[in-house]
């Protein structure tokens, strides 16, 4: 998304940004009236559209409602990226039913168009000191939310050091 902004002032950063292919991911949040009797709180799924399922309500400090989060795998998500959310939800619900889950009381599908990077970078951040331009984000540091936070923090520290602000 930022490529046009980087091409003129920071061609090396533009090249880096161009190297990563952003892939989409469908997720589905489910709410149930009562806890599900499944033998797991989270699982990686190796067949069908699902990649990851988790009992979100099992995390400490969560509300008592039974809530599950489902993530579809990247290939399936890409194949269905422009599908209607309701249709995607039904396909994902059917896959979750194969794991023993009933239909939820409420569900909501969410398409994340830019969810994952291929290849996965592992460089924390990128910085062009002459231009004072940097890049950070989950796409540069593991692809997860904690990677986004540590990437942003590391770039902020670099900016502070570069401008002698400490």
Regions found by a protein language model. Name each.
Residues 19, 81, 85, 141-148:
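Aromatic-acidic/polar surface patches that form glycan- and anion
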């Amino acid at each position: 998304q930022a490529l046009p902004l980087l091409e003129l002032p920071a061609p090396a950063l533009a090249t880096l940004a161009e190297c990563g292919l952003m892939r989409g991911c469908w997720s589905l949040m489910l709410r149930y009236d009562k806890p599900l009797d499944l033998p797991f709180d989270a699982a990686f799924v190796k067949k069908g559209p699902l990649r990851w399922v988790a009992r979100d309500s099992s995390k400490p400090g969560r509300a008592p409602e039974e809530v599950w989060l489902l993530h579809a795998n990247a290939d399936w998500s890409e194949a269905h990226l422009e599908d209607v959310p309701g249709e995607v939800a039904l396909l994902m619900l059917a896959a979750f039913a194969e794991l023993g889950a009933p239909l939820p009381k409420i569900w909501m599908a969410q398409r994340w168009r830019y969810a994952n990077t291929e290849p996965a970078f592992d460089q924390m951040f990128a910085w062009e000191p002459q231009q004072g331009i940097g890049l950070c984000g989950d796409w540069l540091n593991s692809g997860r939310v904690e990677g986004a936070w540590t990437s942003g923090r590391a770039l902020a520290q670099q900016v502070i050091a570069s401008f002698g602000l400490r």
